[in-house]
């Protein structure tokens, strides 16, 4: 078979298959061109999910007629000259416009700033229809109609108009976050108008426009640098999470990317604080010398390659974990909204009490007085489990621990999480704060405290064990016993000493001392299930902290146990002193805060 040179039109159509996969790809390329031209206002209009119409208008520098003629030819660009080592623009390949023109009907009207007039060029299926002077405002208008009309086979692989429109919206959101100084407007017959006014240097304000006010209220600022690589941005508190990773945004030298290394680093940073199947919200911006970065990995320019990927990953993980630790026990502010909905969901519109309430009197109150709650120097850090030794475990009831007037030593204003006032259903602590109240899940909170103690002891190699007077025998399938014994040494590092006890049984002889009384049966069975997913001892060694979290869950104060007032206050104080105590080891919130203003809203007083 004879080798021959392909036609320019066919070459462009092949390139379009890599660069322009769908309408959103075309929108991305055109918006990048507008930003590279210095635009401060970009308007995008669509119809039919971008397949029928995609128009991008900007107020950038514009082009002369001679520039328009070159702009639709492959590898013609004003952005680079003779090297790929110092790319500082979003586009540089010179493929977008010729690729679009080869598979769609493309028209470009432009006028350079300062020029007396503009020009227009039209292309359809790779053929130039006309190039002529035209009236135009300074800037550029690129209009794409009938995308893929020249390659109808590609149309079969596109999604519904609604899905394609949503993909364009996502592209605009990413660009809007990356460039807060630019005004973006997205409109069309297939969508409601979306507008992001310019916010200048206030990046958090732009993120609030795109991600919602809740993100602004639950975001932690990041600013870290290592070996001339700088990381800035915002990350949500662990309890402010979503069911997918669509709200994770990454930018490298201002370029929106969907890089696996960065996304993996985000997951790693939140590994101990978010439940399985949930994803944090984060907006990260990495700035580094362009020479340390390869953006020419893929024609779509959505992937990048770092010269030192380990440095970048370490910077991201370290910065996020340090920021989370700095925030301490902070939890998501959205809990109050959920609580308000729960309180009000049972009332129909216009509901009113059938009769006025009787005046309050001490005799009418169901509360019974008790001694004031004070900590007396008691610390959960010193005795995380022993505080509950000897307490009874009554069945959960609706009645609460009664209330008395607080003493000066326990005034709510002195503590972020306030002073304990009651215990509900032997599981929830109600504390009064300076401006509202807090409801604490006692098991989840203590679980986190125990885990942090175990992790600290593990890192310092001082995790002591306690010998059981009578070994706990756990019956397991033989294969589970074999798996556990492979990792006996690693479990021993955590203070859990196990050995075989005949066929199908494991003997637990020592448990971590700080756990106090441990549910050894449940702990060993859960560890057996988890270890089944790991293959080597090194895999377990890397997951020792995860195992510690499992142990902490089984060694924490259980639901249904009544606490004394001083124990409740000691738990609150320890939460305030422990980083990450706003969520348990599974990522669920340990407390919900309700502001006084929220309570007043419930009673119509606002």
UniProtKB/Swiss-Prot annotation:
GO BP terms: mismatch repair
InterPro entries: DNA_mismatch_repair_CS (IPR014762), DNA_mismatch_repair_MutL (IPR020667), DNA_mismatch_S5_2-like (IPR013507), HATPase_C_sf (IPR036890), MutL/Mlh/PMS (IPR002099), MutL/Mlh/Pms-like (IPR038973), MutL_C (IPR014790), MutL_C_dimsub (IPR042120)
CDD domains given in the database record: HATPase_MutL-MLH-PMS-like, MutL_Trans
GO cellular component, as recorded: mismatch repair complex
Segments for region (Disordered): 350-371
UniProt key word Iron: no
SMART domains per the UniProt record, alphabetical: DNA_mis_repair, MutL_C
Keywords: DNA damage, DNA repair
One annotated GO molecular function: ATP binding
Gene3D superfamilies linked: 3.30.230.10, Histidine kinase-like ATPase, C-terminal domain, MutL, C-terminal domain, dimerisation subdomain, MutL, C-terminal domain, regulatory subdomain
Family matches, as NCBIfam families: mutl, PRK00095.2-4
Function comment: This protein is involved in the repair of mismatches in DNA. It is required for dam-dependent methyl-directed DNA mismatch repair. May act as a 'molecular matchmaker', a protein that promotes the formation of a stable complex between two or more DNA-binding proteins in an ATP-dependent manner without itself being part of a final effector complex.
Similarity remark: Belongs to the DNA mismatch repair MutL/HexB family.
Protein name, per record: DNA mismatch repair protein MutL
UniProt gene name: mutL
């Amino acid at each position: 078979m004879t080798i021959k040179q392909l036609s320019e039109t066919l070459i462009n159509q092949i390139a379009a298959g890599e660069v322009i996969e769908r309408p959103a790809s075309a929108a991305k390329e055109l918006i990048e061109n507008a930003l590279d031209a210095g635009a401060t206002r970009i308007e995008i209009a669509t119809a039919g999910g971008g397949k029928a119409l995609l128009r991008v208008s900007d107020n950038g520098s514009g082009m002369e007629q001679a520039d328009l003629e070159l702009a639709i030819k492959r590898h013609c660009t004003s952005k680079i000259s003779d090297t790929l080592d110092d790319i500082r623009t979003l586009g540089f390949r010179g493929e977008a416009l010729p690729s679009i023109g080869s598979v769609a009907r493309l028209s470009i009207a432009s006028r350079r700033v300062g020029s007396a007039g503009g020009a227009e060029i039209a292309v359809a299926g790779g053929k130039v229809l006309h190039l002529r002077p035209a009236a135009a405002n300074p800037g550029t208008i690129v209009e794409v109609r009938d995308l893929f009309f020249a390659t109808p086979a590609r149309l079969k692989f596109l999604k519904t108009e609604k899905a394609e429109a949503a993909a364009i919206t996502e592209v605009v959101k990413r660009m809007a976050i990356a460039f807060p100084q630019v005004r973006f407007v997205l409109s069309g017959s297939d969508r409601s108008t979306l507008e992001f006014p310019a916010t200048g240097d206030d990046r958090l304000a732009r993120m609030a426009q795109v991600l919602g006010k809740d993100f602004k209220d639950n975001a932690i600022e990041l600013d870290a640098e290592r070996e001339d690589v700088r990381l800035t941005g915002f990350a949500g508190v662990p309890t402010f999470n979503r069911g997918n990773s669509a709200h994770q945004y990454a930018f490298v030298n201002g370029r929106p990317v969907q890089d696996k290394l960065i996304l993996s680093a985000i997951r790693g940073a939140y590994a101990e604080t978010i439940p399985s199947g949930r994803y944090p919200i984060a907006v990260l911006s990495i700035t580094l010398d362009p020479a340390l970065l390869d953006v020419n990995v893929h024609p779509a320019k959505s992937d990048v390659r770092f010269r030192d990927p380990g440095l970048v990953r370490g910077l991201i993980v370290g910065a996020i974990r340090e920021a989370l630790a700095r925030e301490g026990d902070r939890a998501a502010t959205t809990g109050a909204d959920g609580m308000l909905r729960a309180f009000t969901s049972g009332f129909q519109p216009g509901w009113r009490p059938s009769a006025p309430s009787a005046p309050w009197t001490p005799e009418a109150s169901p509360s019974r007085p008790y001694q004031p709650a004070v900590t007396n120097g008691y610390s959960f850090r010193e005795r995380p489990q022993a505080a509950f030794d000897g307490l009874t475990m009554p069945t959960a009831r609706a009645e609460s621990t009664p209330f008395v007037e607080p003493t000066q030593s326990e005034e709510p204003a002195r503590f972020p999480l306030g002073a304990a006032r009651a215990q509900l259903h032997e599981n929830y602590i109600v504390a009064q704060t300076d401006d509202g109240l807090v409801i604490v899940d006692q098991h989840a909170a203590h679980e986190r405290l125990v885990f942090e103690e175990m992790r600290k002891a593990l890192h310092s190699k001082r995790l002591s064990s306690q010998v059981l007077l009578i070994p706990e025998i756990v019956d397991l399938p033989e294969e589970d016993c074999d798996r556990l014994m492979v990792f006996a040494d690693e479990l021993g590092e955590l203070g859990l000493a196990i050995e075989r006890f005949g066929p199908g049984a494991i003997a637990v002889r020592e448990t971590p001392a700080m756990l106090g009384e441990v549910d050894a049966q449940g702990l060993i069975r859960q560890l057996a299930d988890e270890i089944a997913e790991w293959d080597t001892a090194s895999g377990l060694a890397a997951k020792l902290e995860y195992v510690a979290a499992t142990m902490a869950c089984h060694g924490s104060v259980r639901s249904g146990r009544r606490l004394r007032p001083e124990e409740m206050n000691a738990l609150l104080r320890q939460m305030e002193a422990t980083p990450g105590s706003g969520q348990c080891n599974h990522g669920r919130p340990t407390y919900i805060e309700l502001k006084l203003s929220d309570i007043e809203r419930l009673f119509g007083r606002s």
